[in-house]
């Protein structure tokens, strides 16, 4: 990464140029049939090698004492290499192995205006992307049925925008509000029993708001509260419904924490997910989770921490899907909710020493 600053008339322009390299190699990733945690058979099992190279430029200009702007440009290239090692239908191994690459150029623009010491306004618009599961990018056959499936696009473009305000009400209290929108060129759906992703071929639109508030109580204690709302819809309805499976609509989180000068620190945090769509007219139940931490730093090098996870021992559902499956004794597959509850209440202790 390299910085380069210069003046454009009376305007100071700060530039950053850089490059990134990344490689992920997974010798084995898959979905397997089990009974009471005992392995029965592979549904699919693959080795994945994924690498990326990126170059970027970011520029910030201070136009006036109150107004500044940010501009950025980025290039990304991804290479996917998948070898299918095992599958419920072994004849699909060759078709679900291979290589593919893709690249994308993205740009963004942002404006920030400082009204006074207590209020800052901003607006951003930018292009982006998300990379899809390498297995879904390469696969051409369903590993269970052997039927032909559409491979997913390696990189899917997005366009996002937001306007917001940051409020510094007092030295101890600050808050923020942002309204946002995100358009995605294509949405994927997870097919649980097949262990693959399915390209809907349909784009999506999301918009919502986020509220945050932070308050410092004295010198040791602090309280924070965050709320996020998102309205997510397919651009074109699928099977008569435009709800996106798995897209959360309401998220609330908050906590209270402390950091004392004598080395003690800790927090209590609550997170709540509201009900959300699973498939068409079927909804998933919301969930609430409470965690806590207490720690003590003996010095700059040695500390001990104790975490209490799922303090209320909640049986709320941590993850949920709606798809077709067949249990022993059932004459035919049945569509139903499939879920995993939170891990039971657990206490974990950590001893950390920094060299």
What are these regions (language model features)?
Residues 49-53, 101-105, 157-161, 205-207, ...:
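Residues that define the transmembrane beta-barrel architecture of outer-membrane proteins
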Residues 21-27, 75-81, 125-131, 140, ...:
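Transmembrane beta-strands of outer-membrane beta-barrel pores
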Residues 23, 27, 114-128, 152-234, ...:
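Membrane-embedded beta-barrel scaffold of Gram-negative outer-membrane proteins
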Residues 1-87, 112-114, 176, 224:
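Face-selective signature of the C-terminal outer-membrane beta-barrel domain
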Residues 223, 296-355:
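C-terminal beta-signal and adjacent terminal beta-strands/loops
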Residues 2-3, 176-184, 200-280, 354:
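Gram-negative outer-membrane beta-barrel transporters
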Residues 10-12, 66-69, 118-121, 171-175, ...:
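Repeated loop/turn-to-beta-strand initiation elements of outer-membrane beta-barrel proteins
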Residues 2-4, 55-61, 101, 109-113, ...:
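Residues on the lipid-exposed face of transmembrane beta-strands in outer-membrane beta-barrel proteins
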